[in-house]
Amino acid sequence: MIRQADIITVLMSNNLEPALCSGIVLCEKIIREAGTNKFTLINCFNNFNSKGFPLMVRGFYGLVMVTNCKGTFDTINVALRIEQPQTGHVFFNSVGHVKLREDAVLQGNEVLEIPFQITPFQVSEPGVYSVVILIDNDPIGKRAFTV
């Protein structure tokens, strides 16, 4: 089941249209099917379990879904950040550049699926952490996960 992210809007700098993060799914692996270009998500999860800390979180993937982008764009810069919400400490940050076809005109009803590979990072204590999604450095969505 896809867990719905908190929906936060930000005005797209190019066209003054609100972009929405409609979902963030965490999983162990993402495979893109060659023939259909569809994604297969392997072993989806919502939290990490540990018997002790500090915990070295092994690598995993995040699939981000962005919608309500209207107009023409060369690229859309999307970032995924993992942080401790109380302190703002960032454990992981990655930026993806979504390149669109030259003739593509987004109507706003399309869902852009952006996979992110998340490399290992260390968590020193149990708690609730956040996956934050940004477009052009403006937050558009987030979801919690427990360690």
Residue ranges and their predicted role:
Residues V10-Q122, S130-I135, P139-V147:
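Contiguous segments within soluble domain cores/interaction surfaces
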Residues M1-L11:
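N-terminal amphipathic/basic-hydrophobic helices that include classical n-h-c signal peptides
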